[in-house]
């Protein structure tokens, strides 16, 4: 994450860097209006080969802005190959979640791999960042995500790295955890990396219930 909105004094602008390529989100009118000014500055600052516009976040609707995504500058291959620790991951900067990959979790992925053992479970796995790192030490890993395209990416990334001890399931994580608990199945290592369950004040109560449920069932 090269630019993190308010945290870097640039509210409404998020820029992630994957190797030679950038993904950018312009989330408020002030940044949207300055997009044509910002793009050449990003090119100059990061010496990148291409910039993908990922301004398709739902928060833009609250600002009266349409959702947009597509190439902003240069060229961006699909997928882009990134490296985390000793593993390679293919990610789509255009079609992946948010800016394509969750770079803020990169170090956590590697650390989880060091502590994994026995039978491991990765819930909300996305492209397998936690699952594939854990597979290097765990006996076997189950990766669960509700998105079939994401699960296809996990399988492809496992094959890319020669990893064969990962089972990938495209199913609802809540339903999966309930079924595992009911069946009495247990895991030695469990990772929960859920999306935001509460994106507005009205959703806070339901979001807290969701977080409580997955944590209780994981334990």
Language-model segment annotations:
Residues 1-3, 219:
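Short intrinsically disordered, low-complexity coil segments enriched in acidic
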Residues 3-16, 32-101:
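Non-catalytic substrate-recognition/targeting regions of SAM-dependent transferases
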Residues 18-20, 135:
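Short, flexible turn/loop "capping" segments at secondary-structure junctions
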Residues 21-26:
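Carbohydrate-binding surface patches
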Residues 74-219:
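Rossmann-like S-adenosyl-L-methionine
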